[in-house]
Amino acid sequence: MKPSDDKAQLSGLAQSEESSLDVDHQSFPCSPSIQPVASGCTHTENSAAYFLWPTSNLQHCAAEGRANYFGNLQKGLLPRHPGRLPKGQQANSLLDLMTIRAFHSKILRRFSLGTAVGFRIRKGDLTDIPAILVFVARKVHKKWLNPAQCLPAILEGPGGVWCDVDVVEFSYYGAPAQTPKEQMFSELVDKLCGSDECIGSGSQVASHETFGTLGAIVKRRTGNKQVGFLTNHHVAVDLDYPNQKMFHPLPPNLGPGVYLGAVERATSFITDDVWYGIYAGTNPETFVRADGAFIPFADDFDISTVTTVVRGVGDIGDVKVIDLQCPLNSLIGRQVCKVGRSSGHTTGTVMAYALEYNDEKGICFFTDILVVGENRQTFDLEGDSGSLIILTSQDGEKPRPIGIIWGGTANRGRLKLTSDHGPENWTSGVDLGRLLDRLELDIIITNESLQDAVQQQRFALVAAVTSAVGESSGVPVAIPEEKIEEIFEPLGIQIQQLPRHDVAASGTEGEEASNTVVNVEEHQFISNFVGMSPVRDDQDAPRSITNLNNPSEEELAMSLHLGDREPKRLRSDSGSSLDLEK
């Protein structure tokens, strides 16, 4: 649509000397693609993960409902008085700014590459003036534009709440830029990439095709309380493969490494009303980038090698939940840091929130956090995806995580914040609190909490086994507390020497019990078929099913797996052979 088509709507709005733009570019950068690591490895196991697909749960989830919502907001809009400041209250929260922007999204979308909410920027520095940031390809003086090409200096929303409009120049590449291949070399980076004896936030994790950064140690809130870690969806998931395994530091096809586990649940996009709890835009096709994946640690992974301490930062506090109704300065302008496997420890500033852009197909996308590196330094490099974005300590409190990185230098452009410096790199992140809620996870921030979480996982598994055996035999089965340590391996899935409590089971009953136990799973999620490492020693192999059919009078031995595993077929080396589990 031409700018002149909207002249009637804009003619009565105040003009800003900074509100100049190039209307030839009407699309914003799409999500960056991660360059894969070459791999010739094939997979012989099956696994399936639970993926959260974008859905809407508000009462008005259809296009008509969204239109009615904004139509009702229109009723609360006070009459405009061109050239004068509004008499209503100035916006002071993220919610205020997001509501004003959504209300005027049609105008803003027509003449910009994208928008965000935050404070006005002057000479590269943030002020304390609430504003909607409008990204344009080129800023020129309003003298060289016709009135229809100028954005208003102030926008007013429902109830008379108003804010400034700040135009920020965005150097648009038009296509994803070549991702920088440089890597910072330091003792910290060396440790994160495998030279340390521990693994934790910032450590390198890799699939067969990609590598990235471990974000946080987490646990499931429900079900069997699995302990694992969080990283990006695009780091951990490749739907061209039947399984989604993760290793540290490298997968077996590229070098030495330990099998960490396989993706149990993941999400990539969520509708705006589910993510924010409000309609963030008038476009019915509106989605938020929720790039996250949960990988529970494998059953035979040594949990003692996991640490909750963030290298280069230390102990961290609880997640900083971003409340849309909190004051802007609780987030915008705050100093942050991150620790990633490529660039190590870097610092930056939160410049904006809820970045909005539309692609060429007419779909509206949001990404939560926009960070610019300190002193015009890059905040992240390729491979840092998944890193925690951490608020630096303030007033003696511990640093608190607020997000995870999902994109950075591979974005399609850079921000020009000052006229005397060139464009700067920017990094986009996912709101950590909202991501954990969607994946039903809790972050683990102390080693003591980690041990407690592992114990809870063990108890949950014992309870599941006890319930399954009791339902099968019709007789309650109790497990003595002193036997718990004998039951579990590092994360506890192999069960040994369960007392019979004088239950006389026939061969048929034993077979039914074994079938019941083997298929124990939480029906809300698809079971994971790769709980164990691809290769295990014979001493760890489960006992055969015949032992269940012919139990001794002293004990009943059984094996529990979270989902059936397909037979494995491995290459045999000359001069050696492996007995494989069936």
From Swiss-Prot:
UniProt cross-references to SUPFAM superfamilies, sorted A to Z: Trypsin-like serine proteases
Disruption phenotype: Narrow leaf phenotype. Reduced leaf blade width and plant height. Altered internode elongation pattern. Altered vascular patterns in leaves and culms.
Tissue: Expressed in leaf sheaths, leaf blades, culms and panicles. Preferentially expressed in vascular tissues in leaves and culms.
Locus of motif Nuclear localization signal: 567-573
Comp. bias intervals (Basic and acidic residues): 562-572
Annotated phenotype, changing residue 484 to V: Reduced grain yield
Any Gene Ontology biological process: stem vascular tissue pattern formation
Superkingdom per UniProt: Eukaryota
Annotated GO CC locations: cytoplasm; nucleoplasm
Biased composition (Low complexity): 573-582
Reported function: Involved in the regulation of lateral leaf growth. May be involved in the regulation of basipetal polar auxin transport (PAT) and vascular patterning in leaves. Controls photosynthesis rate by regulating carboxylation efficiency and consequently photosynthesis rate. Controls panicle and spikelet numbers, and grain yield.
Protein name: Protein NARROW LEAF 1
Natural source organism: Oryza sativa subsp. japonica (Rice)
Gene: NAL1
